[in-house]
Amino acid sequence: MHSSPSAGKQRVALVMQYLGTHFHGWQRQPNFSSIQEEVELAIAKVVGQPVTLHGAGRTDAGVHAAAQVAHFDDPVGQIPPHRWSKILNGHLPQDIIVRGSAAVDSHWHARFSALWRRYRYSIYTDQWPNLFADQFSWHYYRFPLQEKTIQAAMEPLLGKHHLAAFHRAGSARRHSWVEVQGVECYRRGPMVYLEIQANGFLYGMVRLLVGMLAEVGSGQRSLTDFNDIWVNQRRDLVKYAAPAKGLCLLRVGYENFPLPDSLWFDSQPLWQFTG
């Protein structure tokens, strides 16, 4: 599957982390700073010409990534693919790092070769504010959250469903089918974590879903109401999205990915707080 390093055009895969706080999302757009543009500029400084970077997931403004996967075509091919990570880190701002890089076949694509993506949403439930938790979580404390209730609400989402109720306007996607492969809600001290794995995600889906699950977990909305809303695609009853800062792209799944599993953060939360 993987090409051997040689002079000439070479496709390179990257595993990246970033803090999304000061960026207007992954995707390049005029007049706004984006992750894609920052990394493309760094690559261009090295190869001396513009390149296009393709990401596995188009995270929104303010959303973080523990392991975003991307690829680009090195037009020169003189740099060994495994060295690109260290080279790029010398040209990137401090809130973006490349953890690893490797050669991939010319047909491999960071987005279209992905089998699934996994997101984690973090909620800080202690009444006392925490400066460090505030950067990466939603401070939700006025109503107690019951993680078992949230888990019970999430489990019927498993499988392939129309999830139009959790699809923000403005997306070019023509359908709302999503195959949800895994869901989990658990607590670590004052932190409540919601994880969801799917073959793909609708625009704004996780944040809209978490916003409603917080209502269910705090007793403001019943499980029956929640099920009726998503089954009947009642987007008009989904009132608000959870803040972007609590969301993190955790991992992307591929067949025979060339970089080691140690680059992924899928077993424990990245940030834990005791209050």
Swiss-Prot record:
Isomerase found in the keyword field: yes
Record: active site = 60
Q: Which residues bind substrate?
A: 119
Read off the Gene3D superfamilies from this record.
Pseudouridine synthase I, catalytic domain, C-terminal subdomain (3.30.70.660), Pseudouridine synthase I, catalytic domain, N-terminal subdomain (3.30.70.580)
Q: Which UniProt keywords apply?
A: Isomerase, tRNA processing
UniProt GO MF annotations: pseudouridine synthase activity; RNA binding; tRNA pseudouridine(38-40) synthase activity
Indicate the family of this protein.
Answer: Belongs to the tRNA pseudouridine synthase TruA family.
Protein name per its UniProtKB record: tRNA pseudouridine synthase A
Q: Which organism is it from?
A: Synechocystis sp. (strain ATCC 27184 / PCC 6803 / Kazusa)
